[in-house]
UniProtKB/Swiss-Prot annotation:
Subunit structure: Part of the 30S ribosomal subunit. Interacts with proteins S7 and S18. Binds to IF-3.
NCBIfam families per the UniProt record, alphabetical: PRK05309.1, uS11_bact
Protein name (record): Small ribosomal subunit protein uS11
Gene3D superfamilies reported in the protein's UniProt record: Ribosomal protein S11
GO CC terms of this entry: ribonucleoprotein complex; ribosome
GO terms, molecular function: rRNA binding; structural constituent of ribosome
N-terminal signal peptide: none
Amino acid sequence: MAKKKAKKSIAKGVVYVAATFNNTVITVTDEMGNVISWSSAGALGFKGSKKSTPFAATEAVADAMAKAKENGIKEVGIKVQGPGSGRDTAVKAIGATEGIRVTFLKDITPLPHNGCRPPKKRRV
């Protein structure tokens, strides 16, 4: 039988929002970068194109923040990465979470200084 995971009491944390065109992944860490909780649209049962919707991102945030609050998180900073549609909605949902105070918001999307050639444009 597996041992029950010990509850940590961490007051401050960082929420990483990775918003791709296909999915939105939310990871809550402590200040050192150790993962406390995570959630994604796909992990919540959204399939296919429904994973990339703003609603799916909101649900993923609610799930990850509920797990984080169990561990005592009260203050978070937000780091957002990627161009996905769930990006803005996820940030708003974190801000609207009861009992959580947002300290900073930072965009950490990697931008090339003219690196790799991008994929060809779609012709539909």
